[in-house]
Amino acid sequence: MDENRRLGAYLLFYWFTSYTQTWAMLQMAQTASLALQHSEGTTGIRHGAGITPAFQAGDEGSTEALFRILDLGAGPAPCGIAAADWFRAAFHVREIEITACDQSTLALHIAEELAQSAGATLRRVAPWRAGPDPIPEGRYNCIVMGHLLNELWKDAPDRIARRETFIIELGNYLAEGGILLILEPALLDTGRDLLALRDRLVKSGWYIMAPCFTQGPCPAIAQHNQTCHSDFAWKPPRVVRELEQRTGLDKDLVKTTALVLTRSRSCQTSLLSDNLYRVVSEPMLNKAGRRRLILCGKQGRIPLSARLGDGYPAESSFKQLCRSDAIYVDKPEQRETGLALGPETRITRL
């Protein structure tokens, strides 16, 4: 990234998308951490359930303590700065230090200036390469890896196993209740690699905070040529909109295949409701004229369909659903091909 034009182009366009991906995934994980099971037959978030330790600020939850973020393969640190901004906004964390590691000294100099303007301290570690170089010593409340993992051992037949070893070692640098965020491109090959790694990490004792509502095997992996990614609507900065017009790029949605993980057992994922789902597809129209979405929950993937115009109370909510929405589906009808809206069905968006 030391080539000035390439870095300049990144700052004008992709910096903002990586920032948005980070913020959105952290927000998704926080929402999921509150989605604990109600008493039987109820829906919605259990008020007073509280935030899991993975989202408590600093040592012993104190907002006065130093909150430490490790950004690996940071570049100009969009992910680290987004995490700092998010934790400050969500939990009023005051003192934030970002340790940013990258091969490019120039990128980290820019990152330091950007972090300073965001009210965070940034410690530069350069030149640094993931794999050969050691992880900077310390205990971190949040570790972020933005579009780095797919570059590691990318042509090696045992790349998934080697990445698992890398992540397990990285977990030793997490503070109690700390979280790890991995962002990858929303592409088939990189996505399936991350999902395969996800399954191995779950078996190794990691917990998926987002986007998954299951700690079982990823159902997308079992289907050939399938992956899973998250979409986020955003309002691009003016410079991004202008570059879109000039280049023909379409960034109405920010997309990523990503995981938010923790080793904390207090996530209570076993308490998640059976009727809690993530929307993992775009709306589709089947041959019978029914509108269909694919949901993913504790039991895996399942279709939810409706014949629009039936006038059921949940139809309006159903028509507004988008990929990545977290929803409760109460009293759906059971069809041979999955779930369907009925007269008593209720949909609640988190």
Predicted regions and their residues:
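Class I SAM-dependent methyltransferase Rossmann-like catalytic core
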Residues: 2-33
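Conserved SAM-binding loop of SAM-dependent methyltransferases across substrates and taxa
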Residues: 76-92
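S-adenosyl-L-methionine
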Residues: 109-136
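A short SAM/SAH-binding and catalytic strip from SAM-dependent methyltransferases
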Residues: 141-160
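A short glycine-rich, Lys/Arg-flanked "PGG" loop and its adjoining helix->strand segment in the class I
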Residues: 161-177
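Conserved beta-strand signature within the Rossmann-like core of class I S-adenosyl-L-methionine
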Residues: 176-184
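Class I S-adenosyl-L-methionine
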Residues: 192-195, 206-259, 265-266
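C-terminal lobe and adjacent flexible extensions of AdoMet/dcAdoMet transferase-like proteins
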Residues: 240-350
